[in-house]
């Protein structure tokens, strides 16, 4: 019978607009369908009142709902559908990706966001792998998805939700079947199945045969985890059933008022219809069991196609249930009558399974997850230092997953070191910070902290200390309540340790750095320029340290602007590659850094030779900076333009540079973090990425030459665990003449950009109190030193003279324009 009916696209993605359907001559549009077609007399509000859709519904959802109603009228009145609808269905059939299961008559639901390129049905092998992964990894869907291989994380997560719900429902149905008498009808999950006679469903068999199981699940897919639909839609089953005896609960608010088949409205945002398996020997009266699932704390509201909500008051929900009971009194003799006492029992069963409506506040209280406190250990635990227990592998799984950086040997080293430190300081409390200095190159501080927490929770360390905390609340997984006590406790430990991975809410401080929100509470900030900051640090170094007897103020443990001296490469740790820099790049970096007391920034272009292990820096491209005086970041637009300029010259981006105008060319903690991120990003393609820091006016440097540091960031962690160690390269200058015209044009651009800035350096002022050179003369000395290695002195002097004249002329024109402006202002004041 199902094969004779036209295939209906229930997704509605390509549904025709209601206006278009009407224009084709269809008289009964969805907005004017009478309730007589659908509702029993006890449900009608008015015999002649037409249905109207809520005006707040969007046009897209309105079209989908109206199309569904038009299709229902076709089934009920045997009227032909409009030509527009048939055309849209044919177009949808051409565009849609057909499921291979459609050949057997089973209707599958495709994702509304993307066509299904995979089998929506879970195979038995996938289900077995899912259950194995659940036992092995718990609720870690990423790992379970990797174990299965053929499913994504979202698919596994969606399947797991239905798996746990069905498992809970099946447990409840087994208890119900044991307590029920043999004379009652079959039940499942505490909901009695009503037998409907053929008379009540006359003319409604066709739409039921074409019914589709629709679930609104998380993220992007619908997962069918029951095998019941296969048997129901098989040809043999359909022949045995005939036309009459299927009933389903409507799946959406638009279908909810179509008949009296459902005694209860569905709850929450998702509901599932599972069809009860039919006994092959008894096909006279098949039944359908409706399972209504709740997601969290349900409220009496439902979403129409996920767009607008139809709110129902609690009293209206009860009235709806009462009307449904009244509507069932008109059943034929084939239906079983339900007495008031049985109805109360049914409501109690529904309430036990969380399927009956409650007031919103009551439902919220009932569904709140309770945090279970872990019991403190009764005695101190002694751990064998040479072995790793299975409980440890379950609690700290990251060291036993085959990672290159986190191995079981490293876990043993960290664990045994923490145990040794506890033996030394016992009975004094052993905190996490005190064990970090002895665990260099053993991973990040977070994984060390998790091992410390695990040992503390089981009583291996800090036993009997007041500071030890055992009641770390974490929702317990109720699906593991039937497992052994030891397994459950180990799983709870793993859950608590995994909860430590969640990051705290972080905000930006006044300098733009990410930090914990609590770190900013009660603080005041003083805004200093880079020069003032360097001067203040010098003064603090010169001040004698005073030992105060009273309580001294605790200094902040993290300063993003703290300068970190670079380590030198040794024979044990050799340079990964050599760095050669062209004279052009050195000249541009010097020019750029000398004209501003704020930090400047730019990109380095060149090439990397894998065979020779050499990085050649051939060009430097200045960029606009987003500077606050204390730090600078590269402007994204300017960065893109600089990358394109380097690519046009045939160079790759192999590094970046920035200036420390008046302090040492050592990277700050923030610079280290930025450089490490760049290195990680570029290393994916096998490229190298270096950082260079130029310090033109360092007060600790009496020489007129700029200080330049070329560095990379290693994987080694500092003693306090707050940063990775930077390493410094020895720079070799390439013996090639620069492109004179290009440098001259870059110089003109730099002067034009910075001469009007507030941070502009007065090039005619003395650069250092112990020197007679002006800032411009100092710049020329730096350039003279660079050019002395690549060209003869005559060419170099001629070029430097041109650079000097360019600076003088442009800065003089600036002074002249300023003088004219001041003169005009004075004259206007006198005239007024």
Curated annotation (Swiss-Prot):
Keyword match Heme: no
SANT domain boundaries: 117-168
Disordered, as annotated region: 1-33, 92-111, 167-191
Bias kind Basic and acidic residues: ranges: 168-179
An example Gene Ontology biological process: proteolysis
Ranges of residues in domain SWIRM: 374-472
Residue ranges constituting the MPN domain according to the UniProt record: 579-711
Family to which the UniProt record says this protein belongs: Belongs to the peptidase M67A family. MYSM1 subfamily.
Gene encoding the protein: MYSM1
Domain of life where this protein originates: Eukaryota
UniProt-annotated binding residues for Zn(2+): 658, 660, 671
Protein name: Histone H2A deubiquitinase MYSM1
Enzyme class: hydrolase
Biased composition (Acidic residues): 1-12
Subcellular location: Nucleus
Gene3D superfamilies, alphabetized: Cytidine Deaminase, domain 2 (3.40.140.10), Homeodomain-like (1.10.10.60), Winged helix-like DNA-binding domain superfamily/Winged helix DNA-binding domain (1.10.10.10)
Motif (JAMM motif): 658-671
Organism name: Gallus gallus
Entry's EC annotation: 3.4.19.-
Short motif LXXLL motif, span: 776-780
InterPro entries found in the cross-reference section: Homeodomain-like_sf (IPR009057), JAMM/MPN+_dom (IPR000555), JAMM_MPN+_peptidase_M67A (IPR050242), MPN (IPR037518), Myb_dom (IPR017930), SANT/Myb (IPR001005), SANT_dom (IPR017884), SWIRM (IPR007526)
Written domain comment of the UniProt record: Binds double-stranded DNA via the SANT domain. The SWIRM domain does not bind double-stranded DNA.
Transcription in keyword set: yes
Keywords: Activator, Chromatin regulator, DNA-binding, Hydrolase, Metal-binding, Metalloprotease, Nucleus, Protease, Transcription, Transcription regulation, Ubl conjugation pathway, Zinc
Gene Ontology CC terms: nucleus
Molecular-function GO term, any one: DNA binding
């Amino acid at each position: 019978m199902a094969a004779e009916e036209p295939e209906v696209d229930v997704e509605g993605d390509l549904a025709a607009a209601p206006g278009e359907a009407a224009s084709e001559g269809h008289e009964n549009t969805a907005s004017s369908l009478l309730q007589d077609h659908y509702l029993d007399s006890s449900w009608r509000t008015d015999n002649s009142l037409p249905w109207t859709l809520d005006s707040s519904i969007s046009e897209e959802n309105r079209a989908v709902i109206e199309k569904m109603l038009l299709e229902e009228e076709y089934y009920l009145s045997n009227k032909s559908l409009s030509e527009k609808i048939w055309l849209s269905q044919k177009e949808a059939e051409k565009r849609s990706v057909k499921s291979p299961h459609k050949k057997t008559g089973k209707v599958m639901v495709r994702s509304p966001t993307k066509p299904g390129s995979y089998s929506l049905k879970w195979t038995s092998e996938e289900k077995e792998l899912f259950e194995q992964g659940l036992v092995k990894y718990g609720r870690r869907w990423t790992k379970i998805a990797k174990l299965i291989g053929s499913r994504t994380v979202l698919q596994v997560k969606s399947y797991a939700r239905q798996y746990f719900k069905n498992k809970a429902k099946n447990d409840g149905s087994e208890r119900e079947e044991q307590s029920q008498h043999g004379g009652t009808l079959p039940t499942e999950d505490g909901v009695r199945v009503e037998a409907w006679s053929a008379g009540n469903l006359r003319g409604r068999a066709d739409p039921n045969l074409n019914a589709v199981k629709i679930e609104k699940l998380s993220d992007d897919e619908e997962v069918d985890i029951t095998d019941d639909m296969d048997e129901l839609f098989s040809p043999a089953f359909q022949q045995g059933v005939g036309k009459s005896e299927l009933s389903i609960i409507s799946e959406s608010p638009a279908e909810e008022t179509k008949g009296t088949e459902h005694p209860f409205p569905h709850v929450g945002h998702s509901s599932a219809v599972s069809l009860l398996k039919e006994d092959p020997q008894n096909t006279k009266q098949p039944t359908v069991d409706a399972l209504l699932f709740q997601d969290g704390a349900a409220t009496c509201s439902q979403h129409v196609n996920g767009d607008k909500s139809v709110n129902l008051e609690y009293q209206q929900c009860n009235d709806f249930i009462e009307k449904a009971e009244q509507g069932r009194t008109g059943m034929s003799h084939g239906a079983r009558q339900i007495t008031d006492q049985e109805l109360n029992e049914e409501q109690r069963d529904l309430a036990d399974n969380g399927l009956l409506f409650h007031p919103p506040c009551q439902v919220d209280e009932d569904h709140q997850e309770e945090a279970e406190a872990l019991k403190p250990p009764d005695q101190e635990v002694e751990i064998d230092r040479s072995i790793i227990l299975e409980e440890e592998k379950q609690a700290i799984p990251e060291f036993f997953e085959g990672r290159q950086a986190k191995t079981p040997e490293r876990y043993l080293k960290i664990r045994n070191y923490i145990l040794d430190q506890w033996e030394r300081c016992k009975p004094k409390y052993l905190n996490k910070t005190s064990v970090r200095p002895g665990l260099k190159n053993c991973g990040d501080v977070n994984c060390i902290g998790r091992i410390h927490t695990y040992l503390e929770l089981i009583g291996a360390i800090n036993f009997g200390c007041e500071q030890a905390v055992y009641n770390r609340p974490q929702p317990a997984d109720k699906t593991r309540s039937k497992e052994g006590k030891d397994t459950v406790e180990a799983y709870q430990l793993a859950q608590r340790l995994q909860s430590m991975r969640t990051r705290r809410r972080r905000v930006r401080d006044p300098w733009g750095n990410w930090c914990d929100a609590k770190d900013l509470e009660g603080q005041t900030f003083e805004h200093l320029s880079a020069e003032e900051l360097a001067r203040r640090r010098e003064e603090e170094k010169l001040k004698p340290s005073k030992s105060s007897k009273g309580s001294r103020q605790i200094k902040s443990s993290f300063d993003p602007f703290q300068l970190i001296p670079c380590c030198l490469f040794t024979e044990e740790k050799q340079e990964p590659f050599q760095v050669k820099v062209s004279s052009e790049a050195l000249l541009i970096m010097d020019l750029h850094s000398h004209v501003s007391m704020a930090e400047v920034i730019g990109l380095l272009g060149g090439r990397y030779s894998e065979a020779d292990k050499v990085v050649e820096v051939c060009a430097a491209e200045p960029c606009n900076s987003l500077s606050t005086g204390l730090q600078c970041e590269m402007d994204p637009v300017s960065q893109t333009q600089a990358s394109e300029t380097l690519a046009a010259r045939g160079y790759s981006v192999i590094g970046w540079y920035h200036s420390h105008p008046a302090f040492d060319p050592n990277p700050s903690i923030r610079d280290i973090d930025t450089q490490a991120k760049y290195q990680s990003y570029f290393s994916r393609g096998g490229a190298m990425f270096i950082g260079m820091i130029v310090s033109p006016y360092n007060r600790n440097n009496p020489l007129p030459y700029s200080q330049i540091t070329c560095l990379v960031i290693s994987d080694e962690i500092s003693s306090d665990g707050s940063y990775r160690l930077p390493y410094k390269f020895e720079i070799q200058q390439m013996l090639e003449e620069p492109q004179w015209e290009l440098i001259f044009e870059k110089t003109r651009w730099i002067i034009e950009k910075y001469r009007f800035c507030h941070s502009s350096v007065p090039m005619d002022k003395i650069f250092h109190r112990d020197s007679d050179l002006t800032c411009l003369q100092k710049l020329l000395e730096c350039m003279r030193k660079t050019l002395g290695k690549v060209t003869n002195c005559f060419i170099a002097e001629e070029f430097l003279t041109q650079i000097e004249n360019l600076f003088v002329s442009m800065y003089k024109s600036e002074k002249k324009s300023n003088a004219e402006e001041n003169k005009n202002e004075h004259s206007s004041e006198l005239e007024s």
